[in-house]
């Protein structure tokens, strides 16, 4: 019994002590007053020393922009927090424009000039302009044509280099000249031209020799009874162009190419060989 009484008395004393304790129920109030009193006694040095630990989260961006002169920390506008949005777009556009400017000429060059045009609803190919030859080039081409109507590839390249023309231009000129020459011969305007040894026509081998063609410039031609007058439809202009055909092959060998003066002086003993 004595122990029970002592326990009860001790518990009652503890409850009384806890109830009468001035610190437990007023701990929050006393703590606030204590810390507020101490906060008033802090020095400015302690206040600024503890300030960086609580303020960098909210004031660090404002201090950064204050250095650039964009305004105070309190007047900073929310729209200027995104300066890289529009600037990035303009920067992309700035680098995009030169690329587009470079691509534009390429697209223009890729478009070829139209070589076909519509005439009466039908496509017609545009012909290239004709080549205009100078008088020097025409004279040189004419002299070469009188020597040979067909040119080998090295000869054509050499002639084109001498005259300042392309091989295609020389080739086309010779083709046109040959067709014109054949047309004149068929019309009878240039007689005896097919007998030239330079011509590659097979008809020249079957035609008889005509000695009056080779010595038309000699004075004995007027007294030659075998000389035949030229046809009336012959054109003097064409004869002047082809005049070298008549006398330049005299240096070639062959009995049918010799002038008539040399043919009459053959020795009489040559018939004994047969």
From Swiss-Prot:
<feature type="compositionally biased region" description="Low complexity">
    <location>
        <begin position="259"/>
        <end position="274"/>
    </location>
</feature>
<protein>
    <recommendedName>
        <fullName>Distal-less-like protein DLX-3</fullName>
    </recommendedName>
</protein>
<comment type="similarity">
    <text>Belongs to the distal-less homeobox family.</text>
</comment>
<dbReference type="GO" id="GO:0030855">
    <property type="term" value="P:epithelial cell differentiation"/>
</dbReference>
<dbReference type="InterPro" id="IPR009057">
    <property type="entry name" value="Homeodomain-like_sf"/>
</dbReference>
<keyword id="KW-0238">DNA-binding</keyword>
<dbReference type="InterPro" id="IPR020479">
    <property type="entry name" value="HD_metazoa"/>
</dbReference>
<keyword id="KW-0539">Nucleus</keyword>
<feature type="compositionally biased region" description="Polar residues">
    <location>
        <begin position="199"/>
        <end position="220"/>
    </location>
</feature>
<keyword id="KW-0371">Homeobox</keyword>
<keyword id="KW-0217">Developmental protein</keyword>
<dbReference type="InterPro" id="IPR017970">
    <property type="entry name" value="Homeobox_CS"/>
</dbReference>
<dbReference type="GO" id="GO:0000978">
    <property type="term" value="F:RNA polymerase II cis-regulatory region sequence-specific DNA binding"/>
</dbReference>
<dbReference type="GO" id="GO:0000981">
    <property type="term" value="F:DNA-binding transcription factor activity, RNA polymerase II-specific"/>
</dbReference>
<dbReference type="InterPro" id="IPR050460">
    <property type="entry name" value="Distal-less_Homeobox_TF"/>
</dbReference>
<dbReference type="Pfam" id="PF12413">
    <property type="entry name" value="DLL_N"/>
</dbReference>
<feature type="DNA-binding region" description="Homeobox">
    <location>
        <begin position="126"/>
        <end position="185"/>
    </location>
</feature>
<dbReference type="InterPro" id="IPR022135">
    <property type="entry name" value="Distal-less_N"/>
</dbReference>
<dbReference type="Pfam" id="PF00046">
    <property type="entry name" value="Homeodomain"/>
</dbReference>
<feature type="region of interest" description="Disordered">
    <location>
        <begin position="189"/>
        <end position="274"/>
    </location>
</feature>
<dbReference type="GO" id="GO:0005634">
    <property type="term" value="C:nucleus"/>
</dbReference>
<dbReference type="InterPro" id="IPR001356">
    <property type="entry name" value="HD"/>
</dbReference>
<dbReference type="InterPro" id="IPR000047">
    <property type="entry name" value="HTH_motif"/>
</dbReference>
């Amino acid at each position: 019994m004595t122990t029970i009484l002592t326990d009860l008395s001790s518990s009652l004393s503890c409850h009384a002590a806890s109830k009468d304790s001035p610190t437990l129920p007023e701990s929050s109030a006393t703590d606030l007053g204590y810390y507020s009193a101490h906060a008033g006694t802090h020095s400015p040095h302690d206040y600024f020393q503890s300030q960086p630990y609580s303020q960098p989260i909210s004031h660090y961006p404002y201090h950064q922009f204050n250095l650039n002169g964009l305004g105070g920390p309190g007047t900073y506008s929310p729209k200027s927090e995104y300066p890289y949005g529009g600037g990035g777009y303009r920067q992309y556009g700035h680098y995009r424009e030169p690329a587009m400017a470079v691509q534009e000429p390429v697209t223009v060059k890729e478009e070829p000039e139209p070589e076909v045009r519509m005439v009466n609803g039908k496509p017609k190919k545009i012909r290239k302009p004709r080549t205009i030859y100078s008088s020097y080039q025409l004279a040189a081409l004419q002299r070469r044509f009188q020597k040979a109507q067909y040119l080998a590839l090295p000869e054509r390249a050499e002639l084109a280099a001498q005259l300042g023309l392309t091989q295609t231009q020389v080739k086309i000129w010779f083709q046109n000249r040959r067709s014109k020459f054949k047309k004149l011969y068929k019309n009878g305007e240039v007689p005896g031209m097919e007998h030239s040894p330079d011509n590659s026509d097979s008809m020249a081998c079957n035609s008889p020799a005509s000695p009056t063609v080779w010595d038309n410039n000699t004075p004995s031609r007027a007294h030659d009874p075998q000389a035949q007058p030229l046809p009336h439809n012959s054109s003097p202009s064409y004869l002047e162009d082809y005049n070298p055909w008549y006398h330049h092959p005299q240096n070639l060998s062959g009995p049918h190419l010799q002038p008539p003066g040399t043919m009459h002086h053959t020795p009489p003993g040559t018939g004994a060989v047969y």
